[in-house]
Amino acid sequence: MRQEIAAAIKDGMPCLAECGGFMYLHEKMEGMDGKCYEMAGVIPGKVWRTPRLTRFGYITLKQNQGISHRKQETAILGESDLGVSPAHEFHYFDSDNCGTAFHASKPESKRGWDCMHGSDHLLAGFPHLYYYANPKIPQAFLKKCLEYKELQK
C-alpha cells in the first residue's frame, strides 16, 4: 500500500496531508522502540518521537514567496497565493524535513519557522489547518482533485 500511495502521488494525484498523514509520507519513521520503519517515501527524511510537545499551539501560516523566480514553481495546489491561514500544531514527533512552503508565526510573539511541503498537487506538513477561516486551501485542493479525475478518464 505504501508503494501504491507513493506512486500515485508521484504520478500527480493530489494529496493534502496533515500531521500523521505528513509523517506517513516520509521515507522513515523511528518508532518508540528506537527502530526505523519504512514509510511511503514521498517526502525525503525521517520522523521521530521527541520527549515533549514540539511547536505546540496556535499559529498563522503564510505562503512563502520567492522560492523561485518562476511563478509555476512557487504555486501550491495551482495557486501562487493561498492567503493567510490560522492553524495549530500539537505533536510529539519531529521531522528532519518539515518543508519551506509556508512560514508559521506564533500570535503575539516573534517566534516563527518554515513548514509544510507544497507543490502543484501536494500540501503536507504538521499544521492542522482551519479550513473555514481560509477556504482557498480546500477549494484549491478540490479543484486539483477534479482536474486529476478528468485526466484519468
Sequence positions of predicted segments:
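Amide-donor transfer/coupling interface in amidating biosynthetic enzymes
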Residues: 48-153
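Cysteine-nucleophile active-site neighborhood
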Residues: 1-69
